[in-house]
């Protein structure tokens, strides 16, 4: 299990903790803004930590994390600031967290940071294990890029539809094909991440960490889709 927890992995966890701490301002930000910007931050951090051993494929994988995180974080931030309909809905559906015990907030914070760390761990292990770039890395990156584009189009189509009728569930574009294409895009993206590191994970510890992150985010996506 030792090779699953090199010292650098704790830097990932600490970074996710620092960035997602924005949730103490508004607790839902632990899983929204804190999520998106944590993934972007972890992508940047891996580029820095392994700057002397990067290859084309590993740079691409890290940059996809950055693109994913900034796109998601930026989209959510814009919605928070500009969408009156969204803010009105959130006031009725989600509590502001002011009465939530501090200990509960801390538990959510730590759990989220751990999840975000394990989500990117397949790429981290590829870098840590010195595996460089191979076919698996490029296939994984391709799947990630497809998921990112798919999710981006879905969010754009939903925003466009909500401007016309804020109260109507979006059923145009990709939403004609699948009920929650934005969530599907998320799942495709993280499947690509797992694929990118599947052939370089060594030992039970690395596999457990990678599967915890993958299963965790897939569970979150299915849970979110069921609530709609």
What are these regions (language model features)?
Residues 88-131, 137-141:
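PAPS-dependent sulfotransferase catalytic domain
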Residues 16-27, 73-79:
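C-terminal ends of transmembrane helices
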Residues 30-40, 85-107, 168-175:
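Juxtamembrane helix-capping/reentrant segments at transmembrane boundaries
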Residues 78-82, 106, 220, 224:
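A general boundary/transition motif marking the beginning of the first structured unit of a protein
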Residues 57-99:
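A basic- and aromatic-enriched beta-loop-alpha substructure that forms the phosphate/nucleotide-
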Residues 26-29, 33, 62, 106, ...:
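Hydrophobic alpha-helical segments of membrane proteins, primarily the transmembrane helices
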Residues 31-33, 102-115, 179-186:
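Select subsegments of transmembrane alpha-helices in polytopic membrane proteins
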Residues 3-16, 20, 38-70, 119-157, ...:
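Hydrophobic transmembrane alpha-helices
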């Amino acid at each position: 299990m030792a090779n699953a927890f090199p010292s650098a992995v704790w830097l990932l966890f600490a970074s996710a903790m620092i960035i997602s701490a924005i949730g103490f301002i508004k607790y839902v930000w632990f899983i929204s803004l804190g999520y998106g910007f944590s993934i972007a931050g972890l992508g940047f951090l891996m580029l820095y930590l392994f700057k002397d051993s990067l290859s084309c494929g590993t740079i691409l994988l890290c940059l996809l994390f950055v693109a994913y995180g900034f796109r998601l974080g930026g989209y959510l931030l814009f919605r928070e600031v500009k969408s009156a309909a969204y803010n009105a809905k959130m006031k009725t559906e989600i509590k502001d967290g002011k009465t939530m015990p501090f200990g509960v907030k801390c538990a959510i914070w730590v759990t989220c940071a751990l999840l975000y760390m394990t989500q990117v761990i397949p790429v981290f292990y590829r870098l840590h294990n010195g595996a460089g770039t191979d076919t698996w890395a490029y296939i994984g990156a391709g799947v990630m890029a497809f998921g990112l584009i798919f999710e981006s189009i879905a969010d754009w189509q939903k925003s466009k539809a909500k401007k016309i009728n804020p109260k109507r569930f979006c059923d145009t574009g990709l939403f004609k094909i699948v009920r929650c294409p934005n969530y599907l895009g998320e799942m495709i993206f993280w499947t690509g991440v797992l694929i990118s590191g599947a052939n370089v994970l060594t030992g039970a510890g690395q596999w457990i960490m990678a599967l915890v992150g993958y299963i965790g985010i897939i569970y979150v996506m299915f849970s979110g889709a069921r609530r709609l």
